[in-house]
Amino acid sequence: MKQVPARLATALMITAFLLTGCSGQTGIKALDRDATPEDALPAFVSVPDPANRDTARLLATRDGVRYFIAESDDSKTACLAVVPPGDSPGWHSGCGQNTGPGKILELQGAGGATASLLADDSDLGKLDPGWTKLTENILVPDP
C-alpha cells in the first residue's frame, strides 16, 4: 500500500516540475507573429551573436528611424537595432540577457540616438522619467 502513495507523490512532483519549467518563458511576444517584408533587416545591418537574424521584426518607426528587435534561438538573448533613414552608416545594435521584466539594454549611437529595449511585462512606473513608449518593448527619450 505504501507504493501507491509513493508513485502518486512522484507523479505529482514530476508534473509540478514540468509546469514550473514552462512558466519561465523568456521570449518577447512581439516576435511571435509571422514576418512581413518590412521586418527584414537592411542588408548593411548586422546583429551580434547569438541573435538569429531571421527572428527580426520591425517594431516601430519614428521620424524615419526604424527600431528592429531579434532574439537568440533559445530566446534568452534579445537584441535591438536602431536604423536611421536611408543607407546611413549611423545604425547601431546591441544585445542583452532577457531574463525577466525590466530593461534588457540601452543603446546610444552616433548623434546621440538612444533607445531602450524592455522585456515583456516590464513595469514602466519603475523606469526613469523622460522616456516615450513606442511599443511595449521599446522606449526612446522624450523629444
Q: Whereabouts are the PLM-identified features?
A:
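C-terminal motif of bacterial Sec signal peptides marking the signal peptidase cleavage site
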Residues: 18-21
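N-terminal secretory signal peptides
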Residues: 30-71
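Extracytosolic low-complexity repeat regions of secreted or lipid-anchored proteins
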Residues: 78-143
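Polar alpha-helical coiled-coil and adjacent low-complexity
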Residues: 49-51, 75, 143
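Bacterial N-terminal signal peptides that target proteins for export
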Residues: 1-12
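Bacterial signal peptide processing site
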Residues: 23-26
